[in-house]
Amino acid sequence: MAKAKYYGTGRRKSSIARVYLVPGTGKVTINKRDMDAYFGLETLKLIARQPLVLTETADKFDVLVNVHGGGFTGQAGAIRHGISRALLQADADYRPALKKAGFLTRDPRMKERKKYGLKAARRAPQFSKR
Protein backbone atom coordinates (compact mmCIF):
# COMPACT_ATOMS: atom_id res chain seq x y z
CA MET A 1 0.00 0.00 0.00
CA ALA A 2 1.22 3.54 -0.81
CA LYS A 3 2.36 5.85 1.98
CA ALA A 4 -0.05 8.54 3.13
CA LYS A 5 0.51 11.89 1.42
CA TYR A 6 -1.13 15.07 2.74
CA TYR A 7 -1.52 18.18 0.57
CA GLY A 8 -2.02 21.85 1.35
CA THR A 9 -1.92 25.03 -0.75
CA GLY A 10 -0.49 28.15 0.87
CA ARG A 11 -0.60 31.73 -0.36
CA ARG A 12 1.03 34.97 0.79
CA LYS A 13 1.38 38.22 -1.19
CA SER A 14 1.99 36.95 -4.75
CA SER A 15 3.57 33.63 -3.71
CA ILE A 16 1.85 30.26 -4.05
CA ALA A 17 3.19 27.13 -2.34
CA ARG A 18 2.07 23.56 -3.01
CA VAL A 19 2.99 21.52 0.06
CA TYR A 20 3.06 17.73 0.45
CA LEU A 21 3.59 16.06 3.83
CA VAL A 22 4.92 12.49 3.72
CA PRO A 23 5.66 10.45 6.88
CA GLY A 24 9.42 10.60 7.36
CA THR A 25 12.27 12.12 9.33
CA GLY A 26 11.66 15.88 9.09
CA LYS A 27 13.54 16.77 5.89
CA VAL A 28 12.23 19.94 4.20
CA THR A 29 12.76 20.20 0.43
CA ILE A 30 11.82 23.39 -1.43
CA ASN A 31 11.87 23.36 -5.25
CA LYS A 32 14.08 20.22 -5.17
CA ARG A 33 16.62 21.98 -2.92
CA ASP A 34 17.27 21.63 0.80
CA MET A 35 15.66 24.35 2.94
CA ASP A 36 19.07 25.56 4.16
CA ALA A 37 20.23 26.01 0.56
CA TYR A 38 16.99 27.73 -0.53
CA PHE A 39 16.55 30.24 2.31
CA GLY A 40 19.65 32.19 3.32
CA LEU A 41 18.16 33.92 6.36
CA GLU A 42 17.53 31.95 9.53
CA THR A 43 14.31 33.92 10.21
CA LEU A 44 12.77 32.68 6.95
CA LYS A 45 13.56 29.07 7.90
CA LEU A 46 11.93 29.63 11.30
CA ILE A 47 8.79 31.14 9.71
CA ALA A 48 8.42 28.17 7.35
CA ARG A 49 8.91 25.61 10.17
CA GLN A 50 6.57 27.26 12.72
CA PRO A 51 3.53 24.96 12.20
CA LEU A 52 5.69 21.82 12.55
CA VAL A 53 7.30 23.14 15.74
CA LEU A 54 3.93 24.20 17.21
CA THR A 55 2.32 20.79 16.58
CA GLU A 56 5.53 18.91 17.56
CA THR A 57 5.61 17.06 14.22
CA ALA A 58 8.96 18.39 12.95
CA ASP A 59 10.52 14.90 13.02
CA LYS A 60 7.42 12.97 11.87
CA PHE A 61 6.95 14.35 8.34
CA ASP A 62 9.11 15.03 5.31
CA VAL A 63 7.94 18.24 3.63
CA LEU A 64 8.04 18.56 -0.16
CA VAL A 65 7.31 22.08 -1.41
CA ASN A 66 6.88 23.61 -4.84
CA VAL A 67 6.72 27.39 -4.51
CA HIS A 68 6.70 30.18 -7.09
CA GLY A 69 6.05 33.91 -7.31
CA GLY A 70 6.96 36.78 -5.01
CA GLY A 71 10.08 37.18 -2.90
CA PHE A 72 11.61 35.11 -0.14
CA THR A 73 9.49 36.55 2.68
CA GLY A 74 6.25 35.96 0.77
CA GLN A 75 7.38 32.45 -0.12
CA ALA A 76 8.21 31.63 3.51
CA GLY A 77 4.73 32.83 4.54
CA ALA A 78 3.10 30.80 1.76
CA ILE A 79 5.00 27.67 2.85
CA ARG A 80 3.88 28.20 6.47
CA HIS A 81 0.25 28.54 5.30
CA GLY A 82 0.54 25.41 3.12
CA ILE A 83 2.14 23.28 5.84
CA SER A 84 -0.61 24.34 8.27
CA ARG A 85 -3.33 23.29 5.82
CA ALA A 86 -1.60 19.98 5.09
CA LEU A 87 -1.28 19.24 8.83
CA LEU A 88 -5.06 19.62 9.13
CA GLN A 89 -5.50 16.87 6.54
CA ALA A 90 -3.09 14.69 8.51
CA ASP A 91 -4.85 15.29 11.84
CA ALA A 92 -7.81 17.62 12.46
CA ASP A 93 -6.92 17.79 16.19
CA TYR A 94 -4.20 20.36 15.32
CA ARG A 95 -6.86 22.90 14.24
CA PRO A 96 -7.34 24.80 17.56
CA ALA A 97 -3.58 25.29 18.07
CA LEU A 98 -2.95 26.34 14.45
CA LYS A 99 -5.99 28.64 14.46
CA LYS A 100 -4.91 30.29 17.74
CA ALA A 101 -1.43 30.92 16.32
CA GLY A 102 -2.99 32.43 13.18
CA PHE A 103 -1.37 30.00 10.73
CA LEU A 104 -4.63 29.06 8.99
CA THR A 105 -5.55 32.65 8.15
CA ARG A 106 -4.62 33.81 4.65
CA ASP A 107 -2.82 37.16 5.11
CA PRO A 108 -4.81 39.50 2.80
CA ARG A 109 -2.22 42.29 2.66
CA MET A 110 -1.13 42.96 -0.92
CA LYS A 111 1.04 45.59 -2.59
CA GLU A 112 -0.96 48.76 -3.20
CA ARG A 113 -1.18 49.80 -6.84
CA LYS A 114 0.62 52.86 -8.20
CA LYS A 115 -1.66 55.85 -8.90
CA TYR A 116 -1.23 58.25 -11.82
CA GLY A 117 0.09 61.67 -10.84
CA LEU A 118 2.15 60.06 -8.09
CA LYS A 119 5.62 58.49 -8.14
CA ALA A 120 4.46 55.37 -6.27
CA ALA A 121 1.31 54.16 -4.48
CA ARG A 122 1.34 57.15 -2.11
CA ARG A 123 4.63 58.93 -2.77
CA ALA A 124 3.91 62.33 -4.33
CA PRO A 125 6.36 64.34 -6.42
CA GLN A 126 8.42 66.82 -4.42
CA PHE A 127 6.49 70.01 -3.67
CA SER A 128 8.15 73.32 -4.57
CA LYS A 129 6.77 76.54 -3.12
CA ARG A 130 8.44 78.70 -5.81
Curated annotation (Swiss-Prot):
InterPro entries: Ribosomal_Su5_D2-typ_SF (IPR020568), Ribosomal_uS9 (IPR000754), Ribosomal_uS9_bac/plastid (IPR023035), Ribosomal_uS9_CS (IPR020574), Ribsml_uS5_D2-typ_fold_subgr (IPR014721)
Gene Ontology biological process terms in this record: translation
Region (Disordered): 109-130
Key words of the record: Ribonucleoprotein, Ribosomal protein
Biased composition (Basic residues): 111-130
Coiled-coil region list: none
Record flagged with keyword Transmembrane: no
Gene3D superfamilies reported in the protein's UniProt record: 3.30.230.10
UniProt-listed Pfam families: Ribosomal_S9
CC annotations in GO: cytosolic small ribosomal subunit
HAMAP family to which the protein is assigned, alphabetical: Ribosomal_uS9_B
Family: Belongs to the universal ribosomal protein uS9 family.
Stated name of the protein: Small ribosomal subunit protein uS9
Species of the source: Lachnoclostridium phytofermentans (strain ATCC 700394 / DSM 18823 / ISDg)
